[in-house]
Amino acid sequence: MENIVNGCNRGILVIFLLFSSFLLHAEKFVFTTAWTPQAEFAGYYVAKEKGFYRDVGLDVVFRSPSLTGSVYHRLETDGCDAGMFSLMAAIDIVAHGTSLVNIFQTSMNSSYLIVSRWGKNPLALRGGRLAVYMSEPNYLAFILDRKRRMNFEWVFFTGNINVFLSGGVDAMAVVSYSEFLLLRQAGFEMKEGSLFRFKDHGYNIQENGVYVKSDYFESHPEQVRRFAAASRRGWEWAALHPEETLDIVMGYVRRENVQTNRVIQRLMLEEILRLQIDSDSGRREFRVRPDMVRRACLLMRDFGMIDREVSYQELMGRTKRLGVDN
């Protein structure tokens, strides 16, 4: 019996040493998300906690942006290996000289909408005060302002709905998985006629994806491929196990003392998963759509945000620049 026990102990020790050796050789991959922990990033947290990243030899470390360390600043200064940007933000960055490559895409639809404070059609609010986020240019709101000659007075806010509820603005640009849910939870009545959903008016452009600098993409092809595969596995698992996924999300929320609750995070997860479904195929495709890249570039160029087109091939790391090496 003693020999059997000793044999079992030796077997356990060997397994532990092999596992420890694997962890020691896992490659560190630092990923800065677009915001502090929330269900918007659930699939990545799942991939970490369920060992999907570890299974492919990656030790993924999450970082959150701050007022002094934006996603772009951290990526540009090598403070992280990958960062999260909306498609339009990535196009803007690339068009202005910093080469980025998309390595994984979750969003397949626009979540942006404008909510009117006084129940009016947002398009009837010419000259009104419109609240928009400070953290990233609200490209679609700026384009709408110029295209429809809205002449909005811009009021920038950092991340809560108080400026709207207090009546300090006439409308607010929000995303359907965050501020829109907070307004509902606060009991604010939003009739469909008081909403402008960008996706329903020719502005359905994908949002957040994961990007690396082109030199990292070229020097670490296996790492980005493995990160994408494990991330997709995490999101697919999250869609099938929402309650356990929320347990994982709330663990991250508590560790960083984020003020939220499970109810709002559940609603956010449901909406994020809905936004991942492609409107044409009805499936989660985890890809950048070339037609949306072209649409975004056309809008941004027409309204002076960029001075050149950024091609789909360029964003995917298949060519350096439109018209070069195609």
Locate predicted features.
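Secondary-structure end/capping motifs
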Residues: 220-305
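N-terminal signal peptide c-region/cleavage motif recognized by signal peptidases
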Residues: 20-21
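Short, glycine-/small- and polar/acidic-enriched structural segments
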Residues: 28-157, 163-174, 196-198
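Pocket-lining segment of extracytoplasmic ligand-binding domains
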Residues: 88-89, 157-163, 167-258
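Conserved C-terminal helix/tail region of periplasmic/extracytoplasmic solute-binding proteins
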Residues: 293-326
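Bacterial N-terminal signal peptides that target proteins for export
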Residues: 2-12
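Boundary at the C-terminal end of the N-terminal hydrophobic targeting segment
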Residues: 24-26
